Amino acid sequence: MQKKFEDCVKTILEIIGENPNREGLIKTPNRVFKAYEFLASGYTQNVKDILNDALFESSNNEMVLVRDIEFYSLCEHHLLPFFGRAHVAYIPNKKVVGLSKIPRLVEVFARRLQIQEQLTEQIAQALMENVDAKGVGVVIEARHMCVEMRGIQKANSTTTTSALRGIFLKNEKTREEFFSLINSAKQVRF
C-alpha cells in the first residue's frame, strides 16, 4: 500500500510539471505518505477504547467544559487543512470521563477526512452515547484553507458550527450557560 501511495505522489508531481527525481523531491513521496498516515490515523482508533477505560462514578451533575481544544483536520473535498478550536461540554449522569479523554475524542474524529459540520456532530454523538451524559454541547470554530488558499481566497474567515444533545437542546438555561462559558474571558493565565 505504501509503494502505491508513493507512486501516486510521484505521478502528481509529474502532472504539475515537477521532476520527482530532483534532489529536493526524491524523498517527498515517502514524507507525504507518513504525513497522511498520521493525519488519517483517526480511522484506526476506536472511541470506546479511549473513553470506556476512563469513566468514573461521580455524584457531579453540573456542566463539565473543556474549551479551546486545538485541532487540525483535512477537508474531504480538497484534502486541504482546516484547523481551529473545539469547545466540548457535557452534563454527567452518574459518571464522569477523564478530562484528557475529551481532547483525545476530538483528535480521533479530526484525524479523518472531514467537513466541519460532520466533525462537530460526531464528537457530540460519541460523547453522548459512550458517556451516557444527560446532555452534550460542542462548538467548533475553524479556518479552512480551501476557502483561504483557493477559490474565493478569503483569508482569516472563520466558520462556527454547533451540535447540541439532550438537556443542551431541551433546556434554554443550560444552553445559555454553555454559550456564556465558552465566550467568557479566559481566567487562567500561563
Curated annotation (Swiss-Prot):
Organism listed in the record: Campylobacter jejuni (strain RM1221)
Reactions catalysed, as given in the entry: GTP + H2O = 7,8-dihydroneopterin 3'-triphosphate + formate + H(+)
GO annotation (BP), single: tetrahydrobiopterin biosynthetic process
> Which domain of life does this protein belong to?
Bacteria
EC numbers on record: 3.5.4.16
Q: Which UniProt keywords apply?
A: GTP-binding, Hydrolase, Metal-binding, Nucleotide-binding, One-carbon metabolism, Zinc
Mind telling me which GO cellular component terms the entry cites?
A: cytoplasm
The UniProt entry, under Pfam families, shows: GTP_cyclohydroI
Question: Belongs to which family?
Answer: Belongs to the GTP cyclohydrolase I family.
Q: Which residues bind Zn(2+)?
A: 75, 78, 146
Q: Which GO terms describe its molecular function?
A: GTP binding; GTP cyclohydrolase I activity; zinc ion binding
Top-rank EC class of the record's enzyme: hydrolase
Q: In which pathway does it act?
A: Cofactor biosynthesis; 7,8-dihydroneopterin triphosphate biosynthesis; 7,8-dihydroneopterin triphosphate from GTP: step 1/1
The family database entries (NCBIfam families) matched by this protein are listed as: folE (TIGR00063), PRK09347.1-2 (NF006825), PRK09347.1-3 (NF006826)
Subunit structure as annotated in this protein's UniProt entry: Toroid-shaped homodecamer, composed of two pentamers of five dimers.
**Protein name listed in UniProt:** GTP cyclohydrolase 1
| Family annotation (PANTHER family) | GTP CYCLOHYDROLASE 1, GTP CYCLOHYDROLASE I
**CDD domains per UniProt:** GTP_cyclohydro1 (cd00642)
